Amino acid sequence: MSLPRTNSGTAEQNVAQVAQAILDGRISIIAGARQIRRFCGGHAGLDERDPDLTTFVAIDSETDDLPVGDVRQYWAPDALAQKDLEIARCEAMYREPALEAASHLVARFTRDT
């Protein structure tokens, strides 16, 4: 799954893009959470205490030890196989709250576009 391009537009637009990609199944929940987390706090301007964003901040925090994306190339196959089981478990566990939060974010952040 490839990540959506999020290097232009407002933080809200970028989050809506990632959230839609999660809903469409184009990116995983964990990968999407990591991207959404980048737009929270600091210079990005989105408040990570927002209930819908908090869902993704929490998922990112709880799964930050899991190899998702390009870092997988640096992992040994046997270790990766074990982590893949944990990734699958986490994706299933977080699926419902992530999809709910993603749908809220898309509705909120695409309302004015």
Placement of each model-derived feature along the sequence:
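Acidic, Ser/Pro/Thr-rich low-complexity regulatory regions
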Residues: 1-113
